[in-house]
Every structure is written in C-alpha cells, then in structure tokens.
C-alpha cells in the first residue's frame, strides 16, 4: 500500500490517499479516483499536460521505474529532464523528479505529487 499526497496551489490542503501497489494504476488514475484534478488531455504520454513533480518520501528506497522513450521525449521537450536525471534513468532505471501522471505506475512507495493545476505546469 502506498500513501500519496497530492499538492496544488488550487487545493485548500494536501490530499492524502492510499493506493494499492500492483494494481497497475497510474498516478493520474489514482488522482481521478480520489477527486484530485490533475490537468490532462491525451492520457497517452504525448502532450505533457499532466506534468507533475514527484518527491519520494521513503528516503533512499527509491525503486527503479522504466522511463519510456515517449515520456523521455516529452519531458526533454518541456525542459524538465536534466541530463543528469536522463542518464540516471537510462543507466539505473531511477525515475526523474518530473513525470507524466498518465505514465507513472503506482508502486508501494510513499510520494508527494505536486502540480500547478495548469496544463503542463508542475
């Protein structure tokens, strides 16, 4: 079970939700199930409108997570994938700070997910 805190300037306070790991749910899906309004358009990782900033709350216990070529290209195009994080993702499968909520699969890690409420803003 993962605890996910959603945070946005448009929300009066952070929303804490529990998510089942292994269900193959995306962050966007978990947000929608819990009334959190992360902006989105395509839900396929092409547009970048569901950009979020993720902070892992489990310290050093960050799990590997595949960054697809599609997501990598979108993050690079919006300037949210520094070279150091791109290399870390490619070599060690460690996730970058910014992700697309529609492409990020929920695991058993506790997360803080921040978004501005504007499409593509994080």
Swiss-Prot record:
GO cellular component terms listed in the entry, alphabetical order: cytoplasm
Coiled-coil stretches: none
Consequence recorded when altering residue 56 to Q: Considerably decreased protection of nitrogenase
One Gene Ontology term of the molecular function aspect: 2 iron, 2 sulfur cluster binding
Induction behaviour: Expressed in nitrogen-fixing and non-nitrogen-fixing cells, although transcript levels are higher in nitrogen-fixing cells. Expressed during log and stationary phase growth (at protein level). The gene is monocistronic.
Main location class: cytoplasm
Domain characteristics, as noted in the entry: Has mobile N-loop (residues 59-96) that changes position in a redox-dependent manner being folded against the protein in the closed reduced state, protecting its [2Fe-2S] cluster, or away from the protein in the open oxidized state. The open form complexes with the MoFe and Fe subunits of nitrogenase protecting them from O(2).
Subunit relationships: Homodimer. Forms a complex with nitrogenase consisting of 1 MoFe heterotetramer, 1 Fe protein dimer and 1 FeSII dimer; the interaction is electrostatic and disurpted by increasing NaCl levels.
Name of the protein this chain belongs to: Protein FeSII
Originating organism: Azotobacter vinelandii
